[in-house]
Amino acid sequence: SADWHLDSPFGGFTQAQRKLLIQEQRKIPGKIADLCRREECDMVLLAGDLFDGEASWETLAVLKKALADCGVPVLIAPGNHDYCAPGSPWLEESWPENVHVFTGGLESVVIGALDCRVYGAGYQSMDCPGLLEGFRAQGGERYQVAVLHGDPSLAKSPSCPITTAQVRDSHLHYLALGHIHKAGAFQAGRTLCAWPGCPMGRGWDETGPKGVYLVTLED
């Protein structure tokens, strides 16, 4: 999942409408935690922009509880709206033990029980260089996946441009992306690259397919 944009201002709506929309938006983390348990997921990948900007304490409390309730490893790659800078909740808050936040350049963690290596990176400003440039998965684990906030549609985008060639040459099994608010996917080489869109549109300009992806990795 990606692009929750919690605490969005919802400009253009009345005060009553904004209040209702914020309440509905805060239900997203809990709904995804419920889905995770119901589907018996092995891990959760969150590809950035979970916050629209500054996060309220109410939203932080809801998010922490939901992430803990997932009960499995949760790996987060902050994006251009919730980037890791001084004062960021990703750096300043304490997160549940099952949560790993990628706060800098491309790195990886191994989930031994799944024989899986997960690569990720976090934005440190609103702009980010091409994180997959020259990258190739090197781990010996059975599954090689990555979670990034990136733009697969514009090669010159400042929001971590991702090219088809970079996806192909990564030799990942799966690349989970955020940033694009309409769901999409493509295959390049052995790598499936997918972005689920935002789970809740914030205006009439955010229609179309969106939600979350349930992904099964097979040999």
Regions found by a protein language model. Name each.
Residues 43, 53-194, 198-210, 216:
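His/Asp/Glu-rich metal-coordinating catalytic cores
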Residues 1-62, 140:
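N-terminal active-site segment of His-dependent metallophosphoesterases
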